[in-house]
Design a protein with these regions (language model features):
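Eukaryotic PEST-like, Ser/Thr/Pro-rich intrinsically disordered regions enriched for SP/TP/PP repeats
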Residues: 8-9, 22, 37, 51-59
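Active-site-adjacent loops and short helices of periplasmic peptidoglycan-processing enzymes
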Residues: 39-42, 54-250, 259-260
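Short, low-complexity, disordered segments immediately C-terminal to signal peptides
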Residues: 43-49
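Catalytic-site microenvironment of enzymes
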Residues: 15-16, 108, 127, 308
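Hydrophobic membrane-insertion alpha-helices, especially the h-region
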Residues: 17-31
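Hydrophobic single-pass membrane-insertion segments
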Residues: 29-43, 355
Length: 361
């Protein structure tokens, strides 16, 4: 698959507008800003100079001067897979704003500080952000040379699922399976992973597909307890809606930090697209559903290095975003977004505001 042509400036314009909204120079946006401690969002540099006005339309390409991209591709390295992750929600936050998404947290992993939270410990549905934990548990549950053969477990995949395009008889390696979970958010991959791993965990190849998937779900809940995500309970590997499959924004932040300890996950999370050849010889083209890392996307965020999106009618629009700047790692979780563009706009604004605060403190 060839890279897409770069779109002109839509993200740049919106991000500049977000910066000015953050400073209070412009009123009115998809979300209302009540206060941001000075200084606010750092100015963009365009052709070497700070951008000083809002442009509604630009016809010529705009060059943005930023730090070396390699710095943005560094990933978090704070997670110990066997250690509880503690996130304390304070009474007040450095970032104050009113957002339309229902459940939000911005967590500075490096300084162990919550910069913003909204209903962060309230019950929410994770949708496909579930696959962050699916991938971590999978890696720990199977030998690294496991061959995943797609089979009858495809019958468990709910109608209307996001898919990696797997067919019965396809054979994938463990790295390919992680990519199938993290890039196209394949529910087919999630069930092949869960059923294969469930039988390995139980040491019982005779388990039915449903029984094996249930074993894997049990292991996921054990992991949730181990990392301190005690307000979460998972029943399925793909995150398709189930009333008993739930989480909180704070718990999803813990899962993001936990996942940072797995190179297979962090390496997959920064891939924009991939053409993969299965062990069985078939090929597939996968695009990452996380548009923060697409440099051709309106939602592109230069410093992003992950992590996972999700959406169901019940969960709303969700994203667990990770980014690195100023030697700090941020996790921004949005669950219950009312629309896709609101999810992305609020994520971009929160990341910029978080790094602006970090820069000055």
């Amino acid at each position: 698959m060839k890279p897409k042509k770069r779109k002109k400036n839509k993200y740049i314009i919106r991000r500049v507008a977000a910066a000015f909204i953050g400073t209070g120079l412009i009123a009115g946006a998809a979300f209302a800003v009540s206060k941001i401690p000075a200084p606010s969002v750092p100015p963009l540099e365009i052709d070497g100079a700070a951008y000083s006005q809002i442009v509604t339309e630009v016809s010529a390409p705009v060059t943005v001067s930023l730090a070396p991209k390699e710095a943005a591709q560094q990933v978090m390295a704070y997670a110990d897979p066997s250690k509880e992750i503690k996130i304390t929600i304070p009474d007040s936050f450095p970032i104050e704003t009113s957002l339309r998404s229902g459940y939000v947290i911005v967590y500075d992993v490096t300084s162990d500080r919550v910069l913003f939270a909204k209903n962060a410990e309230s019950k929410a549905f994770p949708a496909s952000t579930t696959k962050i934990l699916t991938a971590a548990v999978l890696i720990d549950s199977v030998p690294p040379d496991t061959v995943f053969t797609v089979g009858t477990e495809l019958s468990l995949v709910p109608e209307g699922s996001s898919l990696a395009g797997l067919s019965k008889g396809n054979q994938l390696s463990l790295p390919q399976m992680i990519d199938a979970l993290m890039l196209p958010s394949g529910n087919d991959a999630a069930y092949t992973a869960a059923v294969t791993a469930g039988r390995i965990i139980a040491e019982d190849e005779t388990l039915s597909d449903k029984e094996a998937a249930a074993v894997f779900a049990g292991r996921m809940n054990e992991r949730l307890a181990a990392i301190g995500a005690r307000d979460s309970h998972f029943t399925v590997p793909d995150g398709f809606h189930d009333e008993n499959h739930y989480t909180t924004a704070a718990d999803m932040a813990k899962m993001a930090v936990h996942a940072s300890g797995y190179p297979l996950i962090t390496e997959a999370a920064v891939k924009e697209y991939e053409t993969v050849t299965f062990l069985s010889g078939e090929t597939a083209n996968w695009e990452n559903s996380n548009k923060l890392i697409w440099d051709t996307s309106d939602c592109y965020y230069y410093y992003a290095n992950g992590l996972k999106t999700g959406m169901t009618d019940e969960a709303g629009y969700c994203v667990v975003a990770t980014a690195r700047r100023f030697d700090h790692d941020l996790v921004c979780v949005i669950l219950g977004g009312p629309a896709s563009d609101i999810r992305w706009n609020e994520t971009l604004w929160l990341l910029d505001s978080g790094f602006a605060y970090i820069r000055e403190h």
